[in-house]
Swiss-Prot record:
GO cellular component terms given for this protein: cytosol
Keyword Cell cycle belongs to the record: no
Name of the protein described by the UniProt record: Probable transcriptional regulatory protein SH2225
GO biological process, one term: regulation of DNA-templated transcription
Pfam families listed in its UniProt record: TACO1_YebC_N, Transcrip_reg
Localization (cell): Cytoplasm
This protein's record includes keyword Transcription regulation: yes
Keyword terms: Cytoplasm, DNA-binding, Transcription, Transcription regulation
Main location: cytoplasm
Annotated PANTHER family: TRANSLATIONAL ACTIVATOR OF CYTOCHROME C OXIDASE 1 (PTHR12532:SF0)
Coiled coil: none
Record family assignment: Belongs to the TACO1 family. YeeN subfamily.
Provenance organism: Staphylococcus haemolyticus (strain JCSC1435)
GO MF term (any one): DNA binding
């Protein structure tokens, strides 16, 4: 992929020192997925994928059960998936994914976060073309060669397999998430350190110390917003 790997879980743990924020975001996403179809991951592919991702963040069962029960019962909240694109200092690019029951509030909050922290919002498509939607898996205990050979034996295509530190990273097409994960399990993988959808930048940029400080404030401001689920960017943070 030509890009340094940033461990999603470690990044989230650093940014979200209060894990309740992560749990709240997954609770909302699980509710929406369960409400969109059957509240059973065996028959609801969207719900299954969210639950697989939630495992890698150690989301407690009571959070998951509460969200699914809410979808089964009287939960009548409707949420929209929104994507915002924008720019930070020195050509940095950001994609902000949100899940909201109040579009006007979210748009205003995201715009304010950009404006107050050295950035500005762009129009739809102004940034996304520089990123690739990717299913990403992180595994310990197996080499890239072993994983690639095992996947080839199962006739499973992936974009790339690399090693970064203690992790072997598998990049795949997003619509192949479940297929690739099942294939990896067939190779003996029992635990995924990462199982996530990402928007990966095609190229990274580096910022000056001052610009990076501004950029990190922008990221923090966006991730602090209640409706924001994910923030992706093209900066190689030092």
């Amino acid at each position: 992929m030509g890009r340094k790997w940033n461990n999603i879980k470690e990044k989230k743990a650093q940014k979200d020192k209060n894990t309740s924020r992560i749990y709240a975001k997954f609770g909302k996403e699980i509710y929406v997925a369960a409400k969109s179809g059957e509240p059973d991951p065996e028959s609801n592919q969207a719900l299954r994928l969210v639950l697989e991702r939630a495992k890698t963040y150690s989301v407690p069962n009571h959070i998951i059960d509460r969200a699914i029960d809410k979808a089964k019962g009287a939960g009548d909240e409707n949420y929209d998936h929104l994507r915002y694109e924008g720019f930070g200092p020195s050509g940095s690019m950001l994609i902000v994914d949100a899940l909201t029951n109040n579009v006007n509030r979210t748009a205003s909050d995201v715009r304010a976060a950009f404006g107050k922290n050295g950035g500005n919002m762009g129009v739809s498509g102004s940034v996304a073309y520089m990123f690739d939607h990717t299913a990403t898996f992180g595994i310990e205990g197996k080499s890239a060669d072993d994983i690639l050979e095992a996947l080839m034996e199962q006739d499973v295509d992936v974009r790339d397999v690399i090693e970064d530190g203690d992790l072997t990273i598998v990049y795949a097409e997003p619509d192949q998430f479940a297929h690739v994960q099942d294939a990896l399990r067939q190779t003996g993988v029992e635990e995924f350190k990462v199982a996530e959808f990402e928007m990966l930048p095609q190229t990274d940029i580096e910022l000056s110390e001052d610009d990076q400080a501004t950029f990190e404030k922008l990221i923090d401001a966006l991730e602090d917003l209640e409706d924001v689920q994910n923030v992706f960017h093209n900066v190689d943070l030092k």
